[in-house]
């Protein structure tokens, strides 16, 4: 997974709208970033470096998508491609693990003392360039209102599961995300898919005593399956 290059920080006007005159200064932010993943953090860092007041809001935990990856996942890429903010990412082996990535991004957030509001759902964004209004709700039901000159949407795509749109897909025994094999020991599991995620999940399940059937629509696994995974799955 290669972290996208942060968005360029646009020029932000030095003066605030007149409607802000009677409000507390700390209720305003130059930049509000929606999403506390690697890209969102990188955007906040670049805004902060440019001298702007940035805040990050996320409905989940820090780098929530990485947290939800399979527990024992190892990235396909090397650590330097995951670095942000000029903070070195050192790992025990050639490729970082999920746990190493979580620790790294926590360290980055602490180093830059980023203003991050976790477990806050963005409910509405209104207004216009230079004067946006953002309403959020936290996990306790409290409502918060923010105003910002610029908005960066860095929500990613991990929440958008690949749907088959077939009968039975909404049953309780059907899952679109995989965490670990242990709960499925000595059971029958069908994995649907022909790319890396499906291949790695099927192999992990099989290696932990699960009876696995891998279903994919092609005559063979997709060409995108990594070369070091393919021999074991085929």
Enumerate the language-model features and the residues they cover:
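Short beta-strand to alpha-helix junction loop
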Residues: 88-107, 116-118, 219-230
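Helix-loop-beta segment of a Rossmann-like dinucleotide-binding subdomain
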Residues: 82-98, 124, 131-135, 212-219
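Aromatic/hydrophobic pocket-lining residues that form π-stacking "cages" and hydrophobic walls in ligand
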Residues: 43, 105, 233
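Short, glycine/charged-enriched secondary-structure capping and boundary segments
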Residues: 47, 69-73, 131, 165-169, ...
């Amino acid at each position: 997974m290669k972290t996208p290059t942060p968005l360029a920080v646009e020029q932000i006007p030095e003066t605030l709208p007149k409607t802000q005159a009677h409000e507390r200064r700390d209720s305003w932010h130059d930049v509000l970033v929606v999403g506390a993943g690697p890209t969102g953090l990188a955007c906040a860092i670049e805004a902060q470096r440019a001298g702007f007041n940035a805040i990050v809001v996320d409905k989940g935990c820090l780098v929530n998508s990485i947290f939800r990856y399979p527990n024992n996942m190892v990235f396909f890429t090397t650590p330097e491609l995951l670095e942000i903010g000029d903070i070195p990412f050192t790992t025990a082996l050639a490729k970082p693990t999920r746990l190493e990535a979580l620790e790294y991004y926590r360290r980055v957030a602490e180093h830059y003392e980023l203003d991050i509001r976790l477990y806050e759902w963005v409910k509405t964004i209104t207004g216009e360039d230079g004067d946006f209004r953002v309403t959020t709700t936290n996990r306790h039901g409290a409502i918060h209102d923010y105003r910002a000159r610029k908005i960066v949407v860095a929500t990613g795509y991990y929440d958008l599961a690949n749907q088959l749109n077939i009968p039975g897909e909404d049953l309780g025994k059907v899952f679109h995300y995989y965490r670990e094999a242990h709960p499925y020991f000595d059971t029958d599991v069908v994995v649907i898919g022909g790319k890396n995620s499906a291949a790695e999940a099927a192999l992990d399940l099989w290696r932990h005593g699960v009876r696995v059937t891998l279903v994919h629509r092609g005559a063979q696994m997709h060409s995108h399956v990594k070369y070091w995974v393919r021999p074991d799955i085929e």
